[in-house]
């Protein structure tokens, strides 16, 4: 089972992810907590230095930080070299003009998802909790498959056109065939990713807070994911001020702390109602987490 937690920065994704992972580990399930957030705040929450390979936290819980940027750069460098090889004999072709096109958004996110997929297929863990970077990075990751597929198909079409040019001779033909094969394999894995994200074995959860910015970001993200066919399972609203009751609220006039708390409690009520309506309209589950 994969739990993918996402939401805007500062809403408590890492705290929720760590709590989720610890819960399953305490239930006796072998659990892996993975963070793709560049800030790597998981280290701070768990108070353990976490590296790029699974680090043992408890008997049933491992954790790791992932940074797929280096792997993505290495792969794209290979792509660039092969494109230069294919196009080098074309009159007027600038071998460096393709460099920027090769570094399109989403490749590092693709390799991050590749790592998650590999751990899921290995069956070393029953539960994987994926603490993602803020929403923008996550959306780029979720849309990366289509962007990468489009990019790969452009390269393959380019190869076909070049092969049809009269008198054109490929350099490093055997290497070119290998890179084309690798591109085609990536297309196949992209299809697997999309099926995986929509499967019952994945729970994509939006973490939010009861504020205007928090609600708007959550609603936009939900709408976007629905548009690309990625189902959201639940919305987790964090930092809720609980109802402390009449005895506490009665001290508002004489206790500044009570007054501030009651003010925040009152401000949050309308947003909690909006979240409630949002999950009802979209048949989702709503989970509320209080600040105390």
Give the label of every model feature segment:
Residues 193-292:
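C-terminal lobe/tail of nucleotide-utilizing enzymes
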